[in-house]
Each structure stands twice: as structure tokens, then as C-alpha cells.
């Protein structure tokens, strides 16, 4: 919402594989839905073809922000094809397809000054001291300017949940100190607490 408020002519390209963001969701944040291009996607290749086509037609002066919800939930086309063919084989093409997607989009995003926010999943490394790792392979990691891994705890009053305390773990950043932990508190009544992460 902040990007669209800052630039009157800005638009949001919203790629959706989880379908958890109906129009009412955008309206609740004060986002003008006529400035949102909502694109449902089913697989990595579909995202790649549409995103590259959109980026090819955007100029540096255009104010565009791109969101993907979620990369972690996207199958590869091969995985879908194998399912339709009733093949139960491991899909080794997904990480390769994601790496290709980010390899192709990164120059466009950088040269045209377009922010892209992508939701992804994490998994725990195997080992004595496992840590959360971003899924999807190295392409996502290397192309990113920032990678934040979010954790949360419930804020309760008795047994009633009043909101959440989020911790932003800065896994990678070109702008802030890596491995920082930034607390953000959000309550149902007041929203984001004004001084979260500052005190």
C-alpha cells in the first residue's frame, strides 16, 4: 500500500498461487483495486512466461511493484505433467526452473528499478544445529537483495489471542546488518505498534 500511496500512477502486479488474497483483502488496506493486476498462476513456467513478458514492456520511468504469493507453493510444469501421467517420480526440475526465473528477471528488475516481493517457504536443515533455510535452491538466494525469515509468537490475555509478536530474522541484506533480529508487535485492536523494533 505504501508504494501505491507514494506514486499516484503506480500499479501492483500480483501473482497468486495460494488464492488467499481476495479483492476485499486489498480494500481493507486502502488499496485501489483498479491499480492491481491480479494474475492467478499454477506453475513456475507460467509465472516465468508472464513475468518476463510484463517486464519486457515496462520502462524505467514506469512505477510498478511486483508481488508473488507464493513461490514456495508453486509446482513445476513437469511435476504437474507427471501427476497427469500418474508418474510418481521425484521432480528435480523445480529448483532449476526457479533459478532460471530469477536469473532472467534480475536484470530487468535492477535496470528498470522495479521492486519485487516474493513469499516463500522455509525448511529446517538436517544436522545437529538445524537452521531455517529458504526453499527453492540457490537462484532465489543469490538474486535477492533481502531475505527475511519471519517467526511469530501469540500475544495473549488469559486464553484470548490479542495479536502477535513477529521477529524478522534478516538472513541476507544489502541494506541492513545481516543476522539482525527485528521485533514487530501487531494487535487486533491497534495494528502495528508505532515503536515496534525501535526500542
What are these regions, as identified by a protein language model?
Residues 91-197:
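Phosphate-binding/switch region of NTP-binding enzymes
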Residues 3, 58, 109:
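Hydrophobic pocket-lining residues that define ligand/cofactor binding sites across diverse proteins
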Residues 1, 62-66, 198-199:
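Generic low-polarity alpha-helical segments
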Residues 1-7:
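Glycine-rich P-loop/Walker A and Walker A-like loops and their local beta1-loop-alpha1 context
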Residues 7-100:
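Conserved inter-motif catalytic segment of the P-loop NTP-binding fold
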Amino acid at each position: 500500500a505504501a508504494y501505491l500511496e507514494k506514486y499516484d500512477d503506480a500499479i501492483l502486479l500480483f501473482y497468486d498461487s495460494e488464492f488467499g488474497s481476495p479483492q476485499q483483502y486489498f480494500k481493507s488496506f486502502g488499496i485501489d483495486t483498479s491499480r492491481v493486476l491480479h494474475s492467478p498462476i499454477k506453475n513456475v513456467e507460467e509465472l516465468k512466461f508472464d513475468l518476463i513478458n510484463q517486464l519486457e514492456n515496462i520502462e524505467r520511468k514506469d512505477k510498478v511493484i511486483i508481488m508473488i504469493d507464493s513461490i514456495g507453493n508453486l509446482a513445476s510444469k513437469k511435476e504437474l505433467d507427471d501427476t497427469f501421467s500418474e508418474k510418481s517420480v521425484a521432480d528435480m526440475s523445480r529448483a532449476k526452473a526457479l533459478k532460471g526465473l530469477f536469473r532472467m528477471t534480475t536484470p530487468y528488475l535492477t535496470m528498470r528499478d522495479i521492486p519485487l516481493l516474493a513469499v516463500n517457504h522455509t525448511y529446517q536443515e538436517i544436522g545437529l544445529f538445524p537452521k531455517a533455510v529458504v526453499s527453492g535452491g540457490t537462484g532465489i538466494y543469490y538474486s535477492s537483495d533481502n531475505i527475511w525469515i519471519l517467526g511469530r509468537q501469540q500475544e495473549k490475555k488469559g486464553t484470548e489471542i490479542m495479536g502477535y509478536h513477529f521477529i524478522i530474522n534478516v538472513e541476507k541484506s544489502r541494506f541492513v546488518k545481516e543476522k539482525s533480529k527485528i521485533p514487530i508487535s501487531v494487535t487486533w485492536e491497534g495494528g502495528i505498534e508505532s515503536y515496534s523494533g525501535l526500542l
